[in-house]
């Protein structure tokens, strides 16, 4: 879906004379990058989802070059807020912890919890997409995070509860 679905959307945007296509990229394309992570950081997708998101972004930017379709891409870091995912690995930690809190089970932390994540609230994601759609700039890639990475241990401390390190 991340590649073929994106290509279908790009073709639809091109056929429909859409003014701007904003691709929902992912920070996962960087792999386990040091923070802060800039847009020019080395791409190192460590698993199929990350690779497929990066390939979708490359397709969107290719349509920009080949078909002159106005495109921007936003590489979203760990989004949280209403309707947050409660399953998954890297990007779902906030939702997984909320589910564990509601179920009154210990937080499962992989490793020692010192690893950090950059979180961004869902309404900030919406604002970023609107800004990327309205800008006169095209062919741009933007990282979207709060710019203030937090450790997993700190996140658990904020939510409050017992921890099981695995």
Predicted features along the sequence, with ranges:
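Catalytic helix-loop patch of NAD(P)-dependent Rossmann-fold dehydrogenases
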Residues: 1-11, 15, 19-20, 28-73, ...
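Residues in well-ordered alpha-helical elements
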Residues: 7, 87, 95, 123-126, ...
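Short-chain dehydrogenase/reductase
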Residues: 29, 77, 141-144
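Conserved sequence/active-site signature of Rossmann-fold short-chain dehydrogenase/reductase
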Residues: 29-30, 79-81, 93, 125
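Glycine-rich "substrate-gating" loop/helix at the edge of Rossmann-like oxidoreductase active sites
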Residues: 46, 77-90, 111-122
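Hydrophobic alpha-helix immediately C-terminal to the catalytic Tyr-X-X-X-Lys motif of short-chain
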Residues: 55, 59, 63, 93, ...
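C-terminal substrate-binding subdomain of Rossmann-fold SDR/epimerase-dehydratase oxidoreductases
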Residues: 102-166
């Amino acid at each position: 879906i991340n590649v073929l679905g994106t290509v279908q959307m790009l073709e639809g945007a091109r056929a429909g004379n859409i003014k701007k296509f904003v691709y929902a990229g992912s920070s996962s394309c960087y792999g386990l990058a040091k923070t802060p992570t800039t847009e020019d950081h080395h791409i190192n997708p460590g698993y199929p989802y990350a690779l497929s998101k990066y390939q979708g972004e490359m397709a969107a930017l290719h349509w920009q070059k080949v078909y002159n379709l106005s495109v921007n891409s936003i590489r979203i870091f760990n989004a949280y807020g209403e309707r947050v995912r409660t399953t998954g690995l890297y990007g779902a930690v906030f939702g997984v912890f909320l589910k564990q809190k509601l179920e009154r089970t210990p937080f499962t932390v992989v490793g020692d919890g010192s690893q950090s994540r950059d979180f961004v609230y869902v309404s900030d994601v919406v604002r970023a997409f609107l800004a990327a759609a309205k800008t006169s700039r095209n062919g741009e890639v933007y990282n979207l995070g709060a710019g203030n990475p937090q450790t997993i241990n700190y996140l658990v401390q904020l939510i409050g509860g017992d921890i099981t390190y695995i």
